[in-house]
Every structure is written in C-alpha cells, then in structure tokens.
Amino acid sequence: MTIKHLRTYSAIIFLISMVSCIDTYDIDFNQKNSVLVVQGFLTDDYTNPDTIKIQYSNFNDGNTFVSPISSVKASIVSTKSGKEVSLVEQKTGGFLPPRDFRIDASEKYSLRFTLPDGQQFESSPEQIYTTPPILNVYNKFILNSKLSDDGKKFISANEVYLDFKDTPKQKDYYLWRYTHYEKIVHCSTCYASQYDPKTLGCTIRLPNFNRTPYYDYQCAGECYAIIKNNKINVMSDVVSDGEVIAGRLIAKIPYHFMYGCLVEIQQMSISPQSYAFHRNLELQTQSTGGLADTPAAAIVGNINNLTNPASKVVGFFGVASIQKKRYWVDRKGVNGIYDYILGHTPFEEPPSMDTSRPPMTSCVKSEIRTPFKPQGWQ
C-alpha cells in the first residue's frame, strides 16, 4: 500500500469512526410524542440570515406536527470573550441575530437558551470555516429523473450540478442547500366548495359537488412559489483534497411548468462535528421530510441540557460561511412528464351567469409564496 493510499485509507477510517460516534437514541413514539428539536446556522449571510429554530416535534398516529415554543430566551455566546448577544424572536417562530451582528473568524460561538419552564440549554462551540466559491452551475433535463412524492410514477426533472475547487492541504467538509422559485398561476384551491371574496376563504359549500373534488382559483397578479430543499447533501474532501470537484449533483427540479425557474444554491463549509451529524441525518432521513420528521432513531447533536444532562435534545447548532449563486433553469425545447405544483391537475370553477365568478385570489406573502419577482428571474 502506497503512502498516498495509506493516508486516504486512514482518513476514511477516521470519517467512519467520527460518524459512528454521533449519539442516537430510540424514541418510543407511542409513549413519548414530543421531542425538542433545535436547528439552524449562524452564517455570514448578513442580508438573509438563517432562522434558528427551537421547537417541539409532536408525533401522533404516524403524523408529525411542529410546534414553535414561545417566550424562549435565546442568545449567542462568544466562548473566548464571553460576550453574549441576545437573539431576536420572530413572530413566525424562530430567532435571528441582531442586524449589526458580525462573525469574528477568531472566535467560537455557542447557542444558549432557556425554555419557559426554566430549563437551560447550551450548544458546544462552533467556528466559521472559509468556503470556496462556486465556479460553474449547469443542468441536464432527464425524462425519468425521480419518483413522485406518492411513489407511484417517475417524473421529469432538471438535474442541477456545480463545480468548485477544494482548498488544498486541509480537511474540508461541505453542505449544500438550495431554494427554487416557480411562477404559479393558481393561488387557492377549494375542496367541495367555492371561494368567497367576502370571507377570503372557501366558505361557499357545495353539497352536491359532483365534478372534481376541488376548484382552483387564479392569482390576481404575479405570484411565485418558494420551494426549499429538505434533502441533506454533504461531502468530505477525504479523497479529493485540493482538486476541482466537478459535477456535484445539487438538485432535481421537477418539471412543474413549461416556463423556466430560478434556483439559489448555497455552498457551506462546516465543522467536522456538523458534517458527522448531517451525514448521519442524511442516512436516516432521506426517505422522510427532514429533521423535524420521524427518524428511525433520533440523532443527538451538540445541544446539551444543562438543567437535566440526562435529557437528550435532537438537532445541531452550527456556524458556517456561505457562497451563493442564482441560476436560471431554462425549460425551452423540453417535453416531459409534468409534476403539477398544486399536487393535482388544475381544474378551475367553470363560468356561470354570475359574471363576478370565478373570482381571482390574492398572492399572500409567506415563507412559501411571494408576489414579488425574485432577483435573477428571467
């Protein structure tokens, strides 16, 4: 075995041992139906910081319900200087750092919070690592790319790839996230009912509804869906130190519409501990919706219960540098299998003698929708 192969073998063994050291514990969901989950990054994306979420995941009859916790006192602690900065609680749930907060590359940071019942928690310290830039982004249209959410058919998708150059002579760990934006035509769906502009809801009941189980209503103006990726995508440079990483698969964007769509890719350098946690999470939850959903065994990260050390907390608080790139996916000239963004074939309320119907509905700004054209839209 050559020295190069020996080093590679040793590094692989180190990674395997590191992942296997991540603590997991079985949850009897029939007995314990509520789990404290913490997730989020402190990043150098100061214009669009990560929301740090502290919430309960409740499991009932196989379903998952996420419950934000109000009146939590949360802060970021600089472990070297001891400086503590309070996080700002959001109305929609979660916490953000103050607008003037900046990461010091020489510091390490911990998340500290107290629940309303007085229990105190603190994460192990994390530091920022420099992230190399994204060099190229490109895509391929694949006719039968992925299974539909219900697992009943294959759907077409644009598979998005990127290239970047790994930093040489150091151990690096990467995590990728993406958000994609789709233009949508319909803003409301009413089941066995019609939309009422007076109540802004599906309040006109149709007891003899014998067409389809629903009506879809067009948006009154432009509207864009915001679709965040929920799949974990991590990598170690153990066998590619200093090399150009070409063709890393980042996303499979379903063929929702004949028009193009916009994808924002985030490339992050993360700590070895964060990599081990997310790699373990990747292995356990790729068939589910993410950390808040039910894993085979809950994954304990770096959050410690100071009040009751025996109590386990699921999740991880990390610190990361982000490199971003927005990429336009052009669907011109492709013909594939539609995956309707509504989850069903659109069916609009038919015209009637009442010329005020069917009404159009508003595009209400939220975490999953915006009436404002995203930057980079073509």
Role assignments for model-derived ranges:
Residues T2-S10:
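Bacterial N-terminal signal peptides that target proteins for export
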Residues S17-S20:
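C-terminal motif of bacterial Sec signal peptides marking the signal peptidase cleavage site
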Residues I22-K73, V77-Q378:
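A sequence/structural signal for flexible, mid-protein segments enriched
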